[in-house]
């Protein structure tokens, strides 16, 4: 799975996230995570946390 900057992904937790920084492609990303309680949290996620890419950025 090739994740790019600004892609929207679904996490294995069921939450969605927008990629805001790529630390190492295929390994680790900074993401704005839409939490199930309605809040948004910026956190580091790993490739294995991602279930599927929902949208790809146009960049």
Where are these regions (language model features)?
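Intrinsically disordered, low-complexity linker and terminal regions at domain boundaries
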Residues: 50-59
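Basic/aromatic-rich interaction segments and small domains that mediate binding to polyanionic partners
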Residues: 2-47, 51
